[in-house]
Every structure is written in structure tokens, then in C-alpha cells.
């Protein structure tokens, strides 16, 4: 029901329990607000940021390549990177010719980081596929079999 940030996922049980308790408390508040007649939209402000949502994106191959290039950068949030790396992996499986790493990847993987002074300083090897990036940057997901 709740998205657990990778950093919390790999933390100790005490940290995970604290996070889940907070999420559950916020969700209970949301339910109480709805039960008093507050609209779902207004009550949603009480929900935890970690509440899972459904995201629908429609894009052309060119648009996907652009989003993947921006959102798989190591400076992005883990949640965004994991989602976009999984999307990229699925697109690559559908069309390797369109979504190969030399055509679709973080900018650092295609030659040069566009972040300038804000670069993470850890470029992704040019031959890595999205599944390789996921396995290296998020090994717990790989161990648990939760990669796409």
C-alpha cells in the first residue's frame, strides 16, 4: 500500500517500522476526515507522500527517450529512477533498436553529463542496460526479485 523509499528499505527494522507507523497514522487521519464529510481531494492532503499512486503516461518513442535521459540520472530521486529504469527496460525489450543504451540513456552514459558543477561524478558505463543499472544501484530490489 505504501511506497517505501530505497534508503528506508535497506535500513534497520526500527526505521522501517517507524516509517510504516507514520504512513498508517496519516492514512487513518485521511479516513477520519472523509468520514466527517470532507471531500477526498481535500482529505488527501493528510495522506503520506509514500501512498502509492497510479501514473499514466502516453508518449512517443522520442518523448520516452527524452524522459529516460533526464529521469534516470543519478541525481534524480530513487523512486523516479527506479520507475523510469523499469519503463526503459520494458521499452528496450519491445524494441532494442529504438531503446538501446547508446540511443536512450542518462546523458552521462552517452558521453557527457549535462549537470555541469552539479554532476554526481559517477557516470554510468556506456554498455550498461537498464537492468544492469538497477542491479548495481538498487541491489536489494534485485535480491528480492522486485525488479520488473
Q: How would you name each of these model-derived features?
A:
Residues 1-148:
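Family-specific signature for flavin-dependent thymidylate synthase
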